[in-house]
């Protein structure tokens, strides 16, 4: 699990990121990233719609895998970010490694990792 301070939960927060954030796309994921100078920590929300899979088991697996990947990357992310991750509809179901590689590539492209 992600720590409570790193979770994006409220509808208003998601709406703000969707409206004002910059979009970055990868093979399996789409990210909306908004820099918020008012916070000192990064907050993350994950969205997996029923278009990806009608089965809740599959949608929840994607969310668990992405939370685990973000937990490892949290120390490498810059502070004050609000990130909404959306799993895009895909013909093939990506495994954990493919999701991790795709997410790292998108974050590097967005220049939100330390050292970028």
From Swiss-Prot:
It is an enzyme of class 3 (hydrolase). Keywords: Endonuclease, Hydrolase, Nuclease, RNA-binding, tRNA processing. It catalyses: Endonucleolytic cleavage of RNA, removing 5'-extranucleotides from tRNA precursor. Its EC number is 3.1.26.5. One of its GO terms (molecular function) is tRNA binding. Pfam families: Ribonuclease_P. GO terms for biological process: tRNA 5'-leader removal. One of its GO terms (cellular component) is ribonuclease P complex. InterPro entries: Ribosomal_Su5_D2-typ_SF, Ribsml_uS5_D2-typ_fold_subgr, RNase_P, RNase_P_CS. The keyword tRNA processing applies. RNaseP catalyzes the removal of the 5'-leader sequence from pre-tRNA to produce the mature 5'-terminus. It can also cleave other RNA substrates such as 4.5S RNA. The protein component plays an auxiliary but essential role in vivo by binding to the 5'-leader sequence and broadening the substrate specificity of the ribozyme. Consists of a catalytic RNA component (M1 or rnpB) and a protein subunit. Belongs to the RnpA family. This is Ribonuclease P protein component. It comes from Pseudanabaena sp. (strain PCC 6903).
């Amino acid at each position: 699990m992600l720590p409570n301070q790193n979770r994006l939960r409220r509808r208003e927060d998601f709406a703000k990121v969707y409206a004002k954030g910059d979009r970055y796309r990868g093979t399996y994921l789409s990210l909306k990233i908004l820099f918020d100078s008012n916070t000192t920590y990064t907050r993350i929300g994950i969205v997996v719609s029923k278009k990806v899979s009608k089965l809740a088991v599959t949608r929840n697996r994607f969310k668990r895998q992405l939370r685990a990947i973000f937990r490892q990357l949290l120390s490498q992310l810059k502070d004050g970010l609000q990130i909404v991750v959306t799993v895009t509809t895909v013909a093939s179901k990506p495994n954990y490694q493919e999701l991790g590689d795709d997410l790292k590539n998108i974050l590097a492209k967005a220049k939100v990792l330390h050292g970028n």
